[in-house]
Amino acid sequence: MIEPQMSVVVPVYSVEKEYFEECILSLKQQTLEAIEIIIVADGVKKEILDLCKSFEGQDERIRVVEQENQGVAVARNNGILNAKAPYITFVDADDWVEPEFCAFFYDNLKIIQMCRLYLRQHI
């Protein structure tokens, strides 16, 4: 596995299966391949946990972190604690992102080396 340059934390609790599948597919198709996808299963139902583990088995960049239901803030923090890359971003489990999502942030963060936080809203 390539050393990840960006960790993408995806907290999961209650999500429609189709939206979640689209989310993970969009992350797997990133133009920046040196990413890790950390799915934080926050007390999810068995069906969703099985889906999480299925994704983990399909792609070595995906890791599943299980926790009892503690809410999205704790799930994000748990994702941060498990991140291996120097940069971290978050994606909600019912969202999808464009293929350049990670590359855009990574390229801009590399340019602005002193940057510790970079926010961008795009709808």
PLM region descriptions:
Residues 1-123:
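Nucleotide-sugar donor-binding/catalytic module of glycosyltransferases
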